[in-house]
């Protein structure tokens, strides 16, 4: 009866408390009953369950083998923790990782739990498996108020973990100022190294903790490297921690020069160096000028080393340009930027700010002398080149003197660079013949080969320094004068090694007046290399990423409708930010989920076809049936100019992101995009017969023909004939044999340009939002078509099948056999160039070569014989699709001459 009553009481208590009132006898089961109660600090329930139980309070359970005391300490369950301690829980029991309850309480900042554990003799000096003690955990998390209570129980405040790190190390690394002060006041060793030799100051600098670094330095911390020689300053620069660098330099001024010298270290990232120097330069005007002067001196020294042929070109070139880039960046962020019109760099370097360029004048002086001497000696020694070797020897000796002078300047010697006159050095050259005889004799071309790249890199540095002193968009008059002065030598450099243009002559892209001097050399470079140069500069400054990506912001997605793709695309593109479109494109069709590059390609493909849709009246089909020209009557559509701007944006955007468009324009329209003047040959695309008539006028004497032409033409203006003068007073000026070329050019401009000028302007306004005019001029009209529309596949067998032969050639002639063998050997790009060379188009019409159009309709590809003379190049008549092929004596000569014509240009337009 008594037992039954006891069971009934247990049942009643269980139901009232909604839990069991007895622990299972099995420890494993019992502990999982108690654990949630301990976590919730339900100490009364825990006490009740433990009172009538034989449960082992030190029972370790779970994967990490912790006791309930660990759980209580970890969760801050103070009442349960005290209860467990009173019932015999071991405060120093370690789990599988070596952590005691005190470790867990310290890690989580459980102050009351820590106090009770210490009352019950918890050992503060126990280390876990990684060597961490309770004070390490407090230091990691900055629990200063708890640390004050704990350190009085610690026998060794410098106890080390497995890596030799003390609590001071980790507190400094994590930037806990009060914790660092507490540890130092408790006797922590301020210079104690870990196993790799890293001190607390090293740790503070590794994470840019300026406040803890400041405390350490004020308390007398030593500036020590680790065992690998890495210093606290190295760490600050690697992380871009400008504020911490500033603290180090304030306490150790000698580190300033070390920092400046670090700009030569190619292992350090340039952007972090910039961040550090940018911060330091903004602290004061004096420091700003000091940094720039230091950088200028280092650049000068490196520049002279680069001019010495005994140095490593690649390493010295990269070092010089790197230093100069950093110099220019720091200069631009100064108190008075050139962009705001104050303190211009072309004012003669009179202001203190521009005096920082003075050390560089020594380098520019050496550069100028090198170029003058090479020009002089090449002219003087065209036949006898023995003296030119002397240049190399003597100039290097003088450059070594310049390096010494630069060093003297760096340590504070003042003086003028003007004493290094050209006449002084010219006198030195008079006595260098003996020295020259001691060296292997090199001719002028060898000297250029050895020095061109080095001098060109210094020229690039000179341009960068000149440019950073100018407002945006302006070219330094000094640099323009420099290029004009040394024009012949610079052209000699790039003729000998065209890669110099792409490697060092970036100034050409930013200065049209200089670009024009080198354009013929640039255009002669391989198409592929110019493409790489184009995109290198086009994408400069853009983050490295997949160019066509899904933006994070949903608002950046272009949402368009398939059934109104032209108008809906026009709306969303006009609303979009141009810079965001440069960073990436994401397109989604309304009602569809698909996104990605495939959708973007489809969008460009469909949209480019819509641009030439007759419904919008923007473009009209040309005479060849495959290309399009702006419609002079597009004004029938009220929004036509906005639509032309949109068309320009789409083609510019496609070119920017290397997406091909399914549209081909007339040769003249490509010229308009490139800024190339049109000529009478371009008229053939819209009116072949009229083009022939213009050709006839040019080819024949019109003096006695009685044409009575004037400088005016009759034009149909909305159904009414109007006389339009080609120039002021043109209706009264007769066309004569003397002025007929002007007449042909003016009438061409009327038909091909003036009639569609508003449309061209609208298109270019949109196109130039993405493609700068200076970059696109790297290409001709044929190459621009390839850039925009890609390279078509060419069936050589179909080409052979539909080719005619004239002027003495037959299908089986040896020269013809060689020709087709060469065509088979050409790359796809070269075949397209050949097709363009002869037909003026890179495309084969639908149906193949049998449907190629000429000036008067269908006209097969034709090869005509021409008498051979040495070095004669093939020519073409694009109006009649004729290749004029000399009767070359060998296949090798044929291939060589053909490739020269294709790559260097030998286009012609003649009558049949």
UniProtKB/Swiss-Prot annotation:
SMART domains from the UniProt entry: ANK (SM00248), HECTc (SM00119)
Catalytic activity from the UniProt record: S-ubiquitinyl-[E2 ubiquitin-conjugating enzyme]-L-cysteine + [acceptor protein]-L-lysine = [E2 ubiquitin-conjugating enzyme]-L-cysteine + N(6)-ubiquitinyl-[acceptor protein]-L-lysine
Principal EC category: transferase
Active site positions, chain numbering: 879
GO biological process, one term: regulation of cell migration
Residue ranges occupied by any HECT domain in the UniProt entry: 577-912
Pathway annotation: Protein modification; protein ubiquitination
ANK repeats: 23-55, 64-93, 97-126, 130-159, 163-192, 196-226, 228-253
Cell location: Golgi apparatus, Golgi stack membrane; Cytoplasm; Endoplasmic reticulum
EC number(s) recorded for this UniProt protein: 2.3.2.26
GO molecular function: small GTPase binding; ubiquitin-protein transferase activity
Top-level taxon in the UniProt lineage: Eukaryota
Keyword vocabulary terms for this entry: ANK repeat, Cell cycle, Cytoplasm, Endoplasmic reticulum, Golgi apparatus, Membrane, Repeat, Transferase, Ubl conjugation pathway
GO CC entries: endoplasmic reticulum; Golgi cisterna membrane; Golgi membrane
PANTHER family for this protein: E3 UBIQUITIN-PROTEIN LIGASE HACE1, HECT DOMAIN UBIQUITIN-PROTEIN LIGASE
Summary of the function given for this chain in its UniProt record: E3 ubiquitin-protein ligase involved in Golgi membrane fusion and regulation of small GTPases. Acts as a regulator of Golgi membrane dynamics during the cell cycle: recruited to Golgi membrane by Rab proteins and regulates postmitotic Golgi membrane fusion. Acts by mediating ubiquitination during mitotic Golgi disassembly, ubiquitination serving as a signal for Golgi reassembly later, after cell division.
Protein's name according to its UniProt entry: E3 ubiquitin-protein ligase HACE1
Lineage: Eukaryota, Metazoa, Chordata, Craniata, Vertebrata
